[in-house]
């Protein structure tokens, strides 16, 4: 690892606690499996299987010219440089966003991890333990109603199965699309709406200008990072304010605000 950074975002449910730090296995489209480990501020990547390149990561910093809300700028600059890995698996990104719909962040992580442990591919780790990936679309399609219900996922059964069927048919094409085009394609799938499509593509591409930036997570952490600022209370007004405030820095401002939340709480 040669990146210079101060903070690594581990908000995705696939990051799991391990020996006082965090770890995540990335499943790449070329068949490679990579283990990312974060411990004592040190990030390491180990190839577990396959060949090909490492999972892609991007570094974000607060723009020097950003001064629209000084209190917010100060909070975000306290993070320093922030690293976030792109979700290498579009199917995982879709499934994660579906599980995250309309439930609390902490609960969505519990559901995601239990679902992975029960039905996901088990990847052997160097320490002798194993790591469970998100269940493949073929597996999801084969699960019974009772299997969903046993993990508290009954209300996610239909959207996950619809997404799995669509991914098996269109996934190869989707992975080649530009992020904004992919958003429209995803919304052609039953039960995938704007929030899910935008959140999925942001996770997959790290293009956070496409994230639904007026959602509860951004509103919550913007208000906590800059409590003295008079933020609009309702979602549409906040979205307009946020877009105007960010200008050309919408991607970095949104990601860094979520990173600030990741450092100070649980945003899912």
Question: Locations of the language-model features?
Answer:
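HhH-family (HhH-GPD) DNA N-glycosylase catalytic core used in base-excision repair
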Residues: 1-268
């Amino acid at each position: 690892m040669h990146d210079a950074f101060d903070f690594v975002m581990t908000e995705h449910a696939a990051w799991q606690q391990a020996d006082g730090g965090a770890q995540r296995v990335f499943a790449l489209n070329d068949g490679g499996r990579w283990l990312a480990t974060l411990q004592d501020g040190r990030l390491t990547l180990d190839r577990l299987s396959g060949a090909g390149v490492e999972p892609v990561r991007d570094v974000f910093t607060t723009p020097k010219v950003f001064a629209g809300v000084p209190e917010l700028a100060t909070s975000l600059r306290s993070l320093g440089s922030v690293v976030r890995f792109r979700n290498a698996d579009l199917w995982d990104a879709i499934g994660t966003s579906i599980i995250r719909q309309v439930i609390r962040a902490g609960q969505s992580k519990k559901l995601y991890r239990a679902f992975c442990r029960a039905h996901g591919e088990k990847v052997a780790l160097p320490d002798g333990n194993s790591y469970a990936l998100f269940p493949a679309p073929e597996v999801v399609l084969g699960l019974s109603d009772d299997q969903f219900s046993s993990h508290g996922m009954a209300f996610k059964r239909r959207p996950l199965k619809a997404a799995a069927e669509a991914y098996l048919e269109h996934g190869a094409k989707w992975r080649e699309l530009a992020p904004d085009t992919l958003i429209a394609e995803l919304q052609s799938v039953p039960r995938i709406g704007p929030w899910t499509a935008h959140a999925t593509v942001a996770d997959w591409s790290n293009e956070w200008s496409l994230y639904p930036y007026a959602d509860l997570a951004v509103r919550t952490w913007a208000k906590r990072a800059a409590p003295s600022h008079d933020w609009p209370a309702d979602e549409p007004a906040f979205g307009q304010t946020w877009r105007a405030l960010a200008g050309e820095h919408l991607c970095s401002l949104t990601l860094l605000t979520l990173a600030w939340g990741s450092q100070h709480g649980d945003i899912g």
